[in-house]
Amino acid sequence: MLIIACPGQGSQTQGFLLPWLEAYPQLEGNLASLGKACGADLVRLGTTAEEEEIKDTANAQRLIVGSALAVYRSVFAGVKVDGALGHSVGEYAAAAIAGVIGDHEAMQLVAKRADAMAEAAAKTPTSMAAVLGGEETEVLSAIEQFELEPANFNGSGQIVAAGAKSAIQRLVESPPDKSRVIELKVAGAFHTSFMESAKQSVAQLAESFSPVDPEINLWSNVDGGLAKDGSAFLSSLVSQISNPVRWDKCMTSLSGLGATVIELPPAGALAGLVKRGVSDATAIALKTPVDVEKVPIS
């Protein structure tokens, strides 16, 4: 079983698209088309843009989803893929790969999402922090104690907390027992109630689309379950903006399938989580075009 994993925000690195553009000439046209749909120069962002520019939420989300889709269309054209899933904004790429929405529709939604989340983040000083290790019940208790919210359940003993920046700093200073806390370099408290205004903004645009049911297996960040209804999955993309990412449940769903999980660029984080959390899966991160040779496709 061949499954495509689409990365989330924070995976991008300066110039990561350069080797892909050299190896796949058609990629530039794909990126240009997707960039036009979302109002961004994806080729420049993925090649010559400075690191600070691609860290910006408005740019990062466009670049990550656009790159994943462009590489997928260039590398996997004609390849039978059995399923797809994404982490956070990566779900928009997964939705397009599964045929629920078109590539350009995905980019339009991502553009609205990125801008709305950046705007919401600018209203209040908020942040996020990864809690590594510790007992889950104790970690969640500490998150609640500091009036924070769990934003990501990544599995492998990693939960991301989010909320007021001052509260995040207190959590860093007083980590739960047997854990360490690392503040993340992000613009705000994504996947929490602080993003409610962004959710409403994206919902208005989503209402104008006509999604269809997925053509392949498509797992949801809501509960790790398989999506059957395209309209319901699109609604879940919207609701997830202010709700936690349950990547842990996605990995539970992958367990027992004996799947080969291919992470699209910018790759690395999800493949690492799958390697640690799904014992019978083979995870391949497409960091450079050389990694495509590892994929069992003909």
Residue ranges and their predicted role:
Residues 1-138, 184, 261-290:
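FabD-like malonyl-/acyl-CoA
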Residues 9-11, 36-38, 98-242, 272:
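Alpha/beta catalytic cores of group-transfer enzymes, especially the acyltransferase/condensing modules
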Residues 178, 258-259:
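Short, high-confidence coil segments that cap the C-terminus of an alpha-helix
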Residues 194, 291-298:
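Short, charged, surface-exposed secondary-structure boundary motifs
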Residues 206, 278-281, 296:
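C-terminal alpha-helix/helix-terminus motif
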Residues 246-247:
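Amphipathic coiled-coil/heptad-repeat helices and related helical stalk/stem segments
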Residues 254:
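Small/polar (Gly/Ser/Thr/Ala-rich) solvent-exposed segments
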